[in-house]
Swiss-Prot record:
One of its GO terms (biological process) is immunoglobulin mediated immune response. It is found in: Secreted; Cell membrane. Residues 115-116 are annotated as: Complementarity-determining-3. The gene is IGHV3-53. Residues 77-114 are annotated as: Framework-3. It comes from Homo sapiens. Residues 70-76 are annotated as: Complementarity-determining-2. The lineage of its organism: Eukaryota, Metazoa, Chordata, Craniata, Vertebrata. This is Immunoglobulin heavy variable 3-53. The keyword Ligase does not apply. GO terms for cellular component: extracellular region; immunoglobulin complex; plasma membrane.
Amino acid sequence: MEFWLSWVFLVAISKGVQCEVQLVETGGGLIQPGGSLRLSCAASGFTVSSNYMSWVRQAPGKGLEWVSVIYSGGSTYYADSVKGRFTISRDNSKNTLYLQMNSLRAEDTAVYYCAR
């Protein structure tokens, strides 16, 4: 059986210019279809739970694609392409945003951004 191996990169951006705002990302890795990966985005300089936070991605040679959002009240929404496979969440005590990605596909290969 043939497997596709793809790199998933993780970086972060903060919308607008604000002093002392930092997003530190971990979790990118080498995966294969059907695998799982969790991306983390640790924030400082603002409170994750008081803002809406999004994940977006950019596949090679393509434009930005919105993936998911979590609002301050906890409501979550997903792009149709990831619904049922990806889960956005946050840990308020760690001020960290997460994206749990399951049942990964070759087309999920992209640069992933967390954004405020």
